[in-house]
Amino acid sequence: MEKVVYKMNTESKLLDRKILRSGHKIDQSLLWMVVLMVSFSLLMIYSASIAYAAQDGGDKWFYLSRQAVFLVAGGIAGSIAAKIPMAKWKKWTPIILTFSLALLVAVLFMGREINGAKRWIHMGPVNVQPSEIFKLAVILYLSSFFTRRAEILKQFKKVGFVGVPIVIGLWLLMLEPDFGSVVVVSVIFLSLLFLAGLPNKWFALVILLSVGLLGMLIMLEPYRMARVTAFLDPWEDPLGKGYQLTHSLMAIARGEWFGVGLGSSLEKRFYLPEAHTDFILAVIGEEFGFVGICVLMFCYCWIGWRAFSIGKQARDLELFYGAFVAKG
């Protein structure tokens, strides 16, 4: 353990030199898989949104065009980010974390309320969701912290200090409210704690505390409990709290093994709410069947596997910060 701590603490001095020697190489297999997934997502957004687009403004290309614009903007931003050395990301981590927390505060006052929650800040032609920036900031923050202060993992009392900014962010997320993002950030935190080498007995204790706290937050809000009970048995109230889940299940069941064909979904024609956003997987299942869903899940798992493989390669080069970021 002492050897690992020593290596992680000396990473900052070696990081710039190693990156300059190795250059900026993009994993080609990961890149092409992402291109494939993005292309498929555009196809399905078009298919699932035709009815909604026609109802909203008559332009069946509306949602596809909007997503394509975001894709181009995201591609440009991603290309720029890929050229920035990891050492600079590490240096900028405190700024990014502070900025993300500031946005979480701002959304409470300036946020656009949708379905009773303030999760978006309207900025001209686009809406920004601060919780997504905070998720990235958490990964960068924990990766930076664990490479600089790995020895803190030996002292359980000090581990809580690591989570102070994260707890503040989680509290702000609960005020929106955005319980889904709270769960995602908690999983990121726990996963990186495990990867950083937190002793098993302490990790088990953190897991128990986290699960207990999340369970308490669910029980304190009736609408969250309603969602849980609807998830466990949507057919108990198929026309009420279980409506979306039952129609999702019917869509997937109608798709059977190989689906009814691209564009032939019935549920997307206003039977299934949010068919082109939150419940687009049901449309994929209806049009491409169980086999289509399995292929999609395989692609996601493959991307995760490649990310961990890249993280392992970075760790082998003693680039521990990059390794944590890739796995996060």
What positions do the PLM features span?
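Hydrophobic alpha-helical transmembrane segments of multi-pass inner membrane proteins, especially
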Residues: 31-39, 47, 56-244, 282-328
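N-terminal membrane topogenic signal
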Residues: 20-34
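Extracytosolic (periplasmic/ER-lumenal) interhelical loops and adjacent juxtamembrane/interface segments
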Residues: 242-263
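Short, Lys/Arg-rich, polar N-terminal cytosolic tail immediately upstream
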Residues: 1-23
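Long extracytoplasmic/lumenal interhelical loops at the membrane interface
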Residues: 256-288, 311-317
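Short linear Ser/Thr-Pro motifs
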Residues: 47-50, 265
